[in-house]
Amino acid sequence: MLARRRGAAGADGQEAKPMRIASTMAALGCAIALSACAGGPGHQGVERASLSALTDGDIDALMMTSGDPETAVAHFARSAEAEPARVDLRRGLALSLERTGDHEGAAGAWDEVVASGRATAEDRTHRAAALVRLSRWAEARAALDAIPPTHETYERYRLEAILADVDEQWDRADSFYETAAGLTDTPAGVLNNWGYSKLSRGDHAGAERLFARALSEEPDLFTAKNNLVLARGARRDYALPAVRMTQVERAQLLHTAALAAIKQGDVAIGRGLLYDALASHPQHFEPAASAIAALGAPV
């Protein structure tokens, strides 16, 4: 499918697989409970048997999904140094670095996985995602091009859409965003990104429709609510949309609408919206107060 899409359009994201954590946690709980009991030789033997049930794979899985990310990085870095031939440990290190937000480190770790000659298409996709987060566009494009076209996943198409956006290849971007949205059960995030792409191009109506679609999938996605207000404000509609919101969110969205109005020269409307935001917030809302003061109006 990808190859066909590229031909039609012209030339030119991460979670670990679910693991059996419940059994691991049960074994840990059993060991802890036994150690708390009055101990004798028999109890120690049972405790050792319980702990021996924790294989290296169990520990790695626990680190990947339940452990503190920094602790997981230390674990996999130490393990990979001890057993450099094991690509699974380098993969665990790369994924753990992603969890800490160290995208530079993650990209380097994924480089090592790819250099091992045993990287999967999913590994290469993770590497491309790390490069996209670092805005290393040319390297990200090369990384995606190295993935077989038969590897058609949500994350692959999401990254293709982002790179098409960067290149301002709007038709390709739209095609990739649409495909990505169809490959996930939780499309709100990619619909929101697609909407922001439309907004940046000046297609305010198209952006508004996509933000509304994102909210129909995930009604509490605040980023989509805020972007929807921006899209409406771009065509001078400053009324808040009929979406579910808390009082705090209402204040924040009124503040966004106010700034959109002021940016377009509708200063009086913007000032009124700032006062509404200040009144809506259950506590003192400093961003609105500061904006009012900047306009030379009393708070």
Q: Predicted segment positions?
A:
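N-terminal leader/linker segments that initiate helical-solenoid repeat arrays
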Residues: C37-G92, R99-T100, G108
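Structural marker of alpha-solenoid helical repeat scaffolds
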Residues: A82, A115-G117, I147-T150, G182-L183, ...
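Helix-start (N-cap) detector for alpha-helical repeat units in TPR-like alpha-solenoids
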Residues: V87-D88, T120-E122, T153-E155, P187-G189, ...
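Canonical tetratricopeptide repeat
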Residues: G92, H126, L159-E160, N193, ...
